[in-house]
Amino acid sequence: MSDTPQQDTATPAWGTRRGPTVPYIPGLDGLRAIAVLSVIVYHADPRWLGGGFLGVEVFFVISGYLITLLLVAERERTGTVTLSHFWVRRARRLLPALWTLLTGVGLWCVLFDRDRLGMLRGDAIAGFLYVSNWFQVWTGSSYTSSFAFAPLRHLWSLAVEEQYYIIWPVVMFVLLRRLRRSTLPLLAVWFTALAVVVAGLTAWMYHPGVIGTFAETPDQYMTLFGRHVLRTDFLYLGTLSRSSGLLLGAALAMVWRPWALVRRGMQRATVLFDALGTAAIAALGWTFWVFRDVVRGETEHAYDLLYRGGFLIVGVASVIAIMAVTKPRSVLGRYVVGNPLFVWIGTRSYGLYLYHWAVFQAHRKTAGTPLTVKEFVGLMIITLALTELSYRFIEYPVRMGVLGRAWSRWRDPRSLQDIAFRRRVSVASVVVILLPVVVAVSMAGAQVKPDDITANLDNNEDAVVTIPTIGPRPTTAPGEKWHHRGVAFTP
């Protein structure tokens, strides 16, 4: 990121700004690294970092900020927002690794675990269509169930983001077309207010208490298109209820654009912002630790804090951290959070998030089984290898337009080398096409073979969870079992 981007003293018209669309900001990759590592550690064993699931909220804020920043930058530079170009860029960025994951998980089950192939069908279709969050809400199937085989259910957060990527550019296209550039700060106020409203609605809809069947605890359910679904499922997985972080990031993009941070007063405040950013990152670490009570259920108000302001606290801390690391000449952003290791992890955070959960599941078979340190290290080596291979040979080449160039060379060979290249590409294309087809056909014909525990959970047997209330905590009878059936605690 340049230390001295240009800023006009007056407010220029749309389409008059020169320069790069959005400069590269290593500090943001550093924040991504912190977020994805917290999630991975939590997934390995919640006892290690019980609030690590909140790293997903950090991702939401970063995504809201960057996507809105890209849209505003395009409007400032060209005078318009080309939606088709935006969506093509997002598809190049997200789809290759996702399709690789879906094919790989399906192929693993075809070869080594056919009995579970049928159980993947719904998750695979939902993941492919980016509706995993609503699929889990609708079916009541979350991967927090300690006994679930769910190698694809972590895709719910990507579904939330992709739905945002579809809707938000249209919203911004309309707003930026109708409003003047000078009204961007007002939009920031509106978006912040909407984020607070979403947090307020989440707090209002949340009900503490015991969760059982609908007949036993009807207050813990809500009606969605005629179907009774858990409130905690809806609030944790729902696109609207999880939009507060995305909105906070969007609000920040209205007033905190890297190319507009050249004023001398802002430069002199570098030390102050570094201090605030350090405090914000420390606050995130504190939430990652203190929210372990949400998983353990050791305090009376743990769940209340999560749904009654917890997500908003994480969102605000994330906003402050983003402000600090994106500020020109930020020591925190360039050298601390933006150190080479964190940048390397951050640039591959998408692949790390995609592959780590599937690798963990392939080893332990069930979601709730904690990993030992030795298992964790071994599985992370595999995850890092898969992530790097995916990044170097699938994700990055597609983003850089390699497929388009290969297609042009294949369609119009002009030398013997091009002809040989055409043959190699043809063979590779057949393999790439056949693998997902084989997986899809096998999955379509597979029978669902749930184990006894899954069948019991589907019948709402032995599927009660205690959510602490403001008053005394409910207690269980001697020998009674409690299972986390909702998704309130897992990203």
Where are these regions (language model features)?
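Hydrophobic membrane-embedded alpha-helices
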Residues: P5-Q7, P12-R18, P23-L28, I34-P450
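N-terminal acidic, proline/glycine-rich, low-complexity intrinsically disordered segments
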Residues: M1-Q7, P491
